[in-house]
Amino acid sequence: FSNFPSGMPALVKSVNDLGLKLGIYSSNGTLTCEDLPASLGNEATDADTFAEWGVEYFKYDFCHNVPIPMRAPYIEYISVANSDGSFETVIPADDASLFGDAKILEDERLDSGRYISGLSAHRGSALFGVDVPEDGEYSLTLGIRKKSNSFKYLEVTVNGEDKYATTVPPTKGFTADGRHQVKIKLRAGANTIELENPIASRQDSAAVQYAKMGRELMRATAEYADRNGTEERP
């Protein structure tokens, strides 16, 4: 703000008063091309900030990009629980419907002895069915067979509509199993939970990342306009 002591909203207004629109720049990376802080991993925060400033155009670069991993975790089971712990259900790998290259492998180091492989690089998916007592937010726990000390990516699709993206950090240790949690929303009664990694190339990764920023910008501008009773800026 040293260059714009009145703040960014005032700058936008000054530019608008000249009959012009103001845009801003960031990068789909950890840093911009000038090695300044960028938006990858901070999409929601940056979108909210740009909406509050009143920014009307946006240029999104590709410097210092970190691609989404093509590798998916191996799944031993999933469990679903509500927030107060009064409900929990565990669904083993054997109860999933498998598609594409997804398959069950045996492993004596796991309590269940089995896990799902083949979910990486858009090659396969696993579909679980789960019944819950009421609408609401639930904790989805992924029981993971730990292999490969690397980041892994998974998309969780609930009832064929709502998508939750999650990155599983590198896992190592003496035990063969691990856990990773995702908050999801379910409806009372029957639900489906599909697991897959749709990233099969760097192009796929970029498309998913750019789409995420686009969604956050549209959400942020709509929410800001609704809160302040103003026209929604593009």
Which residue stretches match the model-derived regions?
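Aromatic- and glycine-enriched glycan-recognition loops and surfaces
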Residues: F1-S27, L40-A44
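Active-site neighborhood of glycoside hydrolase catalytic domains
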Residues: D17, S39-R71, S86, S205-P234
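Beta-sheet entry/capping signal
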Residues: K21-G23, T192, E232-P234
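A cross-domain feature marking catalytic cores of carbohydrate-active enzymes
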Residues: I24-N28, F62, N197
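Short, solvent-exposed loop/turn and secondary-structure capping segments
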Residues: Y25-S27, C33-A38, P69-R71, Y153, ...
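Conserved beta-strand edge residues that scaffold enzyme active sites
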Residues: N28-T30, H64, K146, P170
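Extracytoplasmic
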Residues: A72-R219
